[in-house]
């Protein structure tokens, strides 16, 4: 009998420093496939730095990152990333279709022509987020929620195995939040790993399978239900924070 190896992400002894000091210290994480993971922590906890280190925007001073037992740095095409909205130049002159089509470059390379499959992937991704009707519209003409849907479509069109999203729910309406969670759950049903930086400690947090509590180091990594029933959130944010 043959077995398929789990799509597992491993982070071993990761430390990241900026000129003003250490941002992440001795990070050890193991994340199994088919999980929707939420990362929460106070401002300056290193949440965005962790994702940027995974995608190699930031170089650590120590540590290694593996995916399925092999160095992740050799598997960049398998990583999909949605940055914070504040990091995107929304005045850049590009339409919705072209933003999403850019996701296919990791699959086909910079100097290849887009295939029929690429066009089908982009169309399907825009349909999933209900944005196909805006395909010719410039991204700066969209609302905040619509812009976030476009970047989610780009993530889907890439067909990556490891999906990283930095505060995708900031500034979006309730309907867009529902769409995003629904599509992310579809991805984990396909045995992918989805990691989301999340700032809302309200009811939406229960959508995550597991939570990582981060404040420069790992405070806790456990099932969401266990963390919500513990005192670890109050330890991280202060005694005034609690979850039902």
Swiss-Prot record:
Molecular function GO terms recorded: ATP binding; ATP hydrolysis activity
Gene3D superfamilies xrefs: P-loop containing nucleotide triphosphate hydrolases
SUPFAM superfamilies xref list: P-loop containing nucleoside triphosphate hydrolases
Classification via SMART domains: AAA (SM00382)
Binding site for ATP: 41-48
Domain spans labelled ABC transporter: 9-241
UniProt xrefs under InterPro entries: AAA+_ATPase, ABC_transporter-like_ATP-bd, ABC_transporter-like_CS, Metal_Ion_Import_ABC, P-loop_NTPase
Protein name (database record): Probable ABC transporter ATP-binding protein in ycf23-apcF intergenic region
Originating species: Cyanophora paradoxa
Lineage of the organism: Eukaryota, Glaucocystophyceae, Cyanophoraceae, Cyanophora
């Amino acid at each position: 009998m043959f077995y398929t190896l789990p799509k597992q992400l491993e982070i071993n002894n990761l430390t990241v420093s900026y000129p003003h000091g250490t941002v992440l210290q001795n990070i050890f994480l193991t994340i199994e496939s088919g999980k929707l993971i939420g990362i929460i922590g106070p401002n300056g906890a290193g949440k965005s730095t962790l994702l940027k280190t995974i995608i190699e925007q930031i170089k650590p001073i120590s540590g290694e990152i593996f995916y399925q037992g092999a160095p992740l740095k050799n598997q960049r095409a398998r990583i999909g990333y949605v940055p914070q909205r504040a990091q995107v130049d929304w005045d850049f002159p590009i339409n919705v279709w072209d933003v999403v089509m850019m996701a296919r470059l990791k699959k086909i390379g910079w100097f290849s022509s887009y295939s029929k499959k690429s066009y089908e992937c982009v169309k399907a991704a825009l349909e999933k987020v209900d944005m196909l009707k805006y395909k010719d519209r410039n991204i700066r003409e969209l609302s905040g929620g619509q812009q976030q849907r476009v970047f989610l479509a780009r993530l889907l069109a890439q067909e990556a195995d490891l999906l990283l999203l930095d505060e995708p729910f900031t500034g979006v309406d309730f309907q867009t939040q529902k769409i995003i969670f629904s599509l992310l759950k579809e991805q984990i049903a396909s045995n992918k790993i989805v990691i989301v930086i999340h700032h809302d400690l309200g009811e939406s947090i229960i959508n995550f399978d597991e939570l990582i509590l981060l404040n420069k180091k790992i405070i806790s990594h456990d099932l969401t239900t266990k963390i919500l029933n513990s005192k670890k959130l109050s330890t991280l944010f202060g005694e005034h924070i609690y979850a039902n």
